[in-house]
From Swiss-Prot:
Record-given protein name: Ribose import permease protein RbsC
Membrane protein topology class: Multi-pass membrane protein
A Gene Ontology term for the protein's cellular component: plasma membrane
Domain of life: Bacteria
Family note: Belongs to the binding-protein-dependent transport system permease family. AraH/RbsC subfamily.
InterPro entries, per database record: ABC_transp_permease (IPR001851)
Signal peptide range in chain numbering: none
Length: 322
């Protein structure tokens, strides 16, 4: 009897593991079929390219959020970091700074802002939710102070900067290429390096990781810095695409990123998840947004639908963790 129970439990664990890996792919496949049936224009090449451009920004933010959530943390400030770094990049370009240098400096600033989050959480012993909620408010305020609440325009006609957010390379949107390159680098970092193994170890059992010699504080600060850097990179892409910096940019982007991570199978309790799943989650959110737009659904109802999807994803995560 005990042997049968053990075999049944092993089968259940195996099934749960398979569903964790294949579930996001299956969800995306079903969603694409439904949207395609309701509006065949969804699969037109022009719309697919537009979809890839749209998901790039959320993709970059969600990749950083994946590392954060894998440690059992959360970062509510990513949208505010995007807005502040976007404004600073635009301001530098208007002041005559070379766009490439401005983007690099913007990413460094984003990493520093993320580092502040990491230090508040590790050295300040603050809960990630509270710490990043506070910095989100501060960064939003600094953005409004810097821009005086007005968009920053007059970014010039630099070809390279325009290409960064709106251009194509071999027929593929440059933002999508940027997202894919970031994905490859981060996949290697997470799955093929000691840093990635330490990230999983901290999320699985932080006390055990500390006892085993992992420098938890350093790893966490680096992870939040990485999340800030990727948010700033996303902000630079948005600035290029809009050819301006909006003081309200990035609002609710943190929710889309968290939704993508959870839909991709990463556990909110940490220690379990894959960046491949996050990429699929990003495509699910993007397909949902794009499909609802094609169907002419009001933006108000879109928020309701997105909220329901996030709720379902969290409930499924809790069920798996139980």
């Amino acid at each position: 009897m005990k042997t049968e129970q053990l075999q049944t439990e092993q089968k259940r664990i195996h099934f749960d593991g398979v569903m964790q890996k294949l579930g996001p792919f299956l969800g995306l496949f079903i969603l694409v079929i439904i949207v395609s049936i309701l509006n065949p224009s969804f699969l037109e090449p022009l719309n697919i390219l537009n979809l890839l451009r749209q998901v790039a920004i959320n993709g970059l933010i969600a990749f950083g959020m994946t590392f954060v959530i894998l440690t059992g943390g959360i970062d509510l400030s990513v949208g505010a970091i995007l807005a502040l770094s976007s404004a600073l990049v635009a301001g530098m370009i208007v002041s005559g700074v070379d766009p490439v240098l401005a983007i690099i400096l913007g990413c460094i600033i984003g990493a520093v802002l993320g580092m502040i989050n990491g230090l508040l959480i590790t050295k300040g012993k603050m809960a990630p939710f509270i710490a990043t909620l506070a910095t989100m408010t501060v960064f939003r305020g600094l953005t409004l102070v810097y821009t005086d609440g007005n968009p920053i325009t007059g970014l010039g006609t630099n070809y390279g900067f325009q290409m960064f957010g709106r251009g194509y390379f071999l027929g593929i949107p440059v933002p999508a290429i940027t997202m894919v390159l970031a994905f490859v680098i981060l996949w290697v970092l997470l799955h093929k390096t000691p840093f990635g193994r330490r990230t999983y170890a901290i999320g699985g059992n932080e006390k055990a990781a500390l006892i085993s010699g992992i420098k938890v504080t350093r790893v966490k600060v680096m992870i939040y810095s990485l999340a800030g850097l990727l948010s700033a990179l996303a902000g630079a892409i948005l600035t290029s695409r809009l050819h301006s910096a909006q003081p309200t940019a990035g609002e609710s982007y943190e929710l889309d990123a968290i939704a993508a991570v959870v839909l991709g199978g990463t556990s909110l309790s940490g220690g379990r998840g894959r960046i491949v799943g996050t990429l699929i989650g990003v495509l699910i959110i993007g397909t949902l947004n794009n499909g609802l737009n094609l169907l002419g659904v009001s933006s108000f109802y879109q928020l309701v639908v997105k909220g329901i999807v996030i709720l379902i994803a969290v409930l499924l995560d809790r069920k798996k963790s139980a």
